[in-house]
Amino acid sequence: MIIKPNFRRKARACALQMLYSWEISQNNIKDSAIEFLKEKNKKNIDIIYFYELIIGITYNCRSIDDLMKPYLSRSLKELGQIEKAILRISFYELYKRKDIPYKVSINEGIELAKLFGSEDSHKFINGVLDKAALKIKR
């Protein structure tokens, strides 16, 4: 089955919202996801990818954060929760999903920042991911 790119984009946006909620509440991510998806129109979301992101990121959160640290201009504690969640999604894709071109991961991170972040957060996300991509490039 071929997954449409916009289904993946929606999965990333939903994952971002779940990761943001999880970071603040520390609730069980799987239980929260079930409740979250009850309220969403799941028809146009890549549900499998959504679950892969939230489970993969929450289980590997410390290692993902460690991968990000060398590319950040400030500490993780100083990052906004939205920016942190976006970077976690992007770094997860860069390191764990070799089938996704790095340019796609970067672009999707920037688009999430434009949609959910503060006014200039897309510039920050772009800078961090560009630096990381130079090292990671596949």
UniProtKB/Swiss-Prot annotation:
GO BP annotations of the record are: DNA-templated transcription termination; transcription antitermination
Q: Which CDD domains does this entry report, sorted A to Z?
A: Terminator_NusB
Q: Which cysteines are joined by disulfide bonds?
A: none
Q: Name one GO cellular component term.
A: cytosol
What InterPro entries does UniProt report for this protein, alphabetically? NusB-like_sf (IPR035926), NusB_fam (IPR011605), NusB_RsmB_TIM44 (IPR006027)
Q: What keyword terms does UniProt attach to this protein?
A: RNA-binding, Transcription, Transcription antitermination, Transcription regulation
What superkingdom does the record give? Bacteria
Q: Which Gene3D superfamilies match?
A: NusB-like (1.10.940.10)
- Does the entry feature the keyword RNA-binding, yes or no? yes
Q: Does the keyword RNA-binding apply?
A: yes
Per UniProt, what is one GO molecular function of this protein? RNA binding
Record family assignment: Belongs to the NusB family.
The task this protein performs is described as: Involved in transcription antitermination. Required for transcription of ribosomal RNA (rRNA) genes. Binds specifically to the boxA antiterminator sequence of the ribosomal RNA (rrn) operons.
- Any idea what this protein is called? Transcription antitermination protein NusB
Which organism is this entry from? Buchnera aphidicola subsp. Schizaphis graminum (strain Sg)
Q: What is the lineage of its organism?
A: Bacteria, Pseudomonadati, Pseudomonadota, Gammaproteobacteria, Enterobacterales
